[in-house]
């Protein structure tokens, strides 16, 4: 049989390193390990819905819960699942993401792992940037296939959840699937913004509709209440739909074949076509999952970390969330009142009142300041006394939040300089505002990175 060159630049026969050390056939082994699974994390698009947080960074690089980045979630899930071979595909504003990955994830020579960043590039055979999730994977197949693996796990870089990926890969193997999609029961309101599907009694997916908008279409996709027991859904739940989590497991050969075309997106093109022709199965996930796609969802997911019983548990040391070790000192709190708040490493808080807020690393908060439902990203470094004096001489506040400020329902991005007697609140303003000093998105004020808010400003 002659060699056939695919659109991805990959030949069907004679793949790099495929012969030597070729994995055993699926039927001969069912265990999941670092040698037979390769993980690919999608770095995301331009992140327009998270703007201005994505003005200078990619979505996966957006800070999370005080000290982490969004990308730490899928990477930590992989590490906790024993899967240590990861590729991260990036394209937009990726400099800070590259710095974070290179400083946070260094496997030793004996661990058999890596987190390798593959930035979008132009080559003699590829002249365009990534056009979608499937296109990004297609353009990097040549790199993936330099590894021995039977299954490829494709993940999103901007979701909050904790999952043992060995379970979905094991289910994929046991069902003899060609593609397995992680799915989640959701209510009607979010269903219109997700890929919704139906499955039969064997969990094989029989129908898939990307972001259904028509009420009649949604009604036809409802989970039958008789299935609630099988899916471990409480009987009192109503109108549930089976949504794609954007997490996929593909057989190696299946992925190569499905990408032998010019389709650009998994959800819009690849998955609907595969359901008609392939063995595509659902793996139902019952835990907490949040798509951090908008300012509102990002804001609420972060503030939830300060609640009595957070939906996502950062304190679970059986499956910890890893990040860049900064070796910062403990936070110093002088006479402050703090209730339902998360205070990250290295903060200095002087006689402030903080409620239901999340304070990021190296944050400085002056005396008399009140924060209510506020997220601060903190600073990249501590200012020296000389730097503070120079800033004051130039008429700029120091990095952090000054004295006697009142801030509510706001996100303060990194290295922002907020002066004394500043008031920040979205109350009485439009839901979406663009201003030279601030933005309002979904009714939440966002102070951008490196912003300077003078003394006495009222927002």
Where are these regions (language model features)?
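Conserved beta-strand termini and adjacent loop/short-helix elements that scaffold enzyme active sites
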Residues: 118-120, 182, 283-285
